[in-house]
Curated annotation (Swiss-Prot):
GO terms for biological process: cell division; regulation of division septum assembly. It comes from Methylibium petroleiphilum (strain ATCC BAA-1232 / LMG 22953 / PM1). It holds the Pfam family MinE. The keyword Cell division applies. Belongs to the MinE family. The keyword Transmembrane does not apply. This is Cell division topological specificity factor. Keywords: Cell cycle, Cell division. Prevents the cell division inhibition by proteins MinC and MinD at internal division sites while permitting inhibition at polar sites. This ensures cell division at the proper site by restricting the formation of a division septum at the midpoint of the long axis of the cell. The lineage of its organism: Bacteria, Pseudomonadati, Pseudomonadota, Betaproteobacteria, Burkholderiales.
Length: 88
């Protein structure tokens, strides 16, 4: 948008706005964050198991790490199944 367009109050055409949005979506998907599971989640899950194992006896399959998108946020969800003795 040029300075003259800005001062005169010209609005962008719908097609150009849609094109810009599509370019942003494509760039996001190409960066590896659109829909695929990030590489660090596996390492994060292993480290969580190691830290929690210091205090509670758990197995690696007792912890689940999931990343999901909600609106403009990325939510990291960690589910942990504690053994009966630890629930106390």
């Amino acid at each position: 948008m040029s300075l003259l367009s800005f001062l005169l109050g010209e609005k962008k055409k719908t097609a150009s706005v849609a094109k810009e949005r599509l370019q942003i979506i494509l760039a996001h998907e190409r960066s590896g964050r659109g829909g695929s599971r990030p590489d660090y989640l596996e390492a994060l899950q292993r480290e969580l198991v190691a830290v929690i194992s210091k205090y509670v006896s758990i197995k690696p399959e007792d912890i689940k790490v999931h990343l999901q998108k909600q609106d403009n946020l990325e939510v990291l969800e960690v589910k942990l199944e504690l053994p009966e003795a630890a629930r106390g």
